[in-house]
A protein has these predicted regions:
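The feature marks the mature, well-folded catalytic cores of soluble enzymes
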Residues: 1-284
Length: 284
């Protein structure tokens, strides 16, 4: 059996930086460590951090009455008001937001201040998108994630529009949705804020999926970028399997397979990728 491992598989820069930040803080700090939401969308990493005493919170209300310590902002970023609320409660802040996401916050804040209506191309319930929304005027912010939503979008003709994207959104889908909005004739500025690593990962996954008999996509179930990888690979290779760890993979399905491709989301640690690759190789 021939195994093709995507070079781009595994931790991206932003995720690696965020995870390393939490581990360093956990090692050096004598006070409680909290992360605002799971630091990344990977259950194994979050569980390991919990063993080291790192607690996950999902709102500033959860900090009330808790021992003072450090709150680490997750890689996906948060709304502007969250920073103020954490400080007001007397907690220290360590910001592990991905620099590419921080750039979107700055852009959205700037264009919102200049009177633009902000369109975020992405999944409305994704924490990164929820965070981005918190840096612009809520009354002048829309989230579009489907063609149907793009078709239904309407705005007064004199309004200027600034379009940004969730960093992990499907690049081809982004272009499609932008085109639909653009056809409405608004004065639009488009800022492609999809991370380069996301584009490269998706392009490589698509190429490999076209060449193999089976494709394995590794990542957390809540990971948006892994879900996008699965969709892209499944479109090119019917035998595509979405797993979190080797335990989720039925190796018997690969018995008559000559070529297997492996890729992984940006929140998947190398040890999990290596374990999958090793088990597939040893089995056949």
């Amino acid at each position: 059996m021939n195994i093709i491992l995507a070079k781009s598989a595994g931790f991206c820069f932003g995720v690696k930086r965020a995870v390393e930040t939490v581990y360093k803080e956990a090692e050096k700090n004598q006070t409680p460590i909290y992360t605002f939401g799971p630091i990344i969308h990977n259950e194994e990493v979050v569980a390991d951090l919990e063993k080291k005493g790192v607690q996950v919170i999902h709102s500033t209300d959860e900090l009330k009455g808790r021992p003072k310590g450090t709150v680490i902002i997750r890689s996906h970023g948060v709304e502007r008001k969250i920073y103020d609320e954490i400080k007001a409660l007397g907690f220290e802040i360590v910001d592990a937001t991905c620099p590419f996401v921080l750039k979107i916050h700055r852009l959205v804040e700037q264009y919102s201040r200049e009177g633009y209506h902000i369109i975020i191309i992405g999944n409305e319930t994704h924490p990164e998108v929820e965070g981005i929304k918190g840096w612009s005027d809520p009354a002048e912010t829309s989230v579009i994630g489907t063609c149907e939503e793009a078709e239904k979008f309407t705005l007064s003709s004199e309004k200027k529009v600034c379009i940004v994207s969730q960093t992990t959104f499907n690049y081809n889908k982004f272009q499609e949705l932008v085109e639909i909005v653009n056809e409405k004739g608004y004065d639009i500025i488009v800022l492609n804020t999809i991370c380069n690593a996301t584009e490269e990962r998706q392009t490589e996954a698509e190429r490999i999926a076209k060449e193999v008999d089976a494709m394995i996509v590794i990542g957390g179930r809540a990971s948006s970028n892994t879900q996008k990888l699965f969709e892209i690979c499944k479109n090119e290779c019917e035998n595509t399997y979405y797993i979190q760890t080797i335990k989720d993979l039925d190796l018997t399905r690969l018995k008559s397979t000559d070529n297997v491709g492996i890729t992984a989301g940006a929140s998947t640690p190398n040890n999990i990728i290596e374990e999958v690759q090793k088990n597939v190789r040893n089995e056949f």
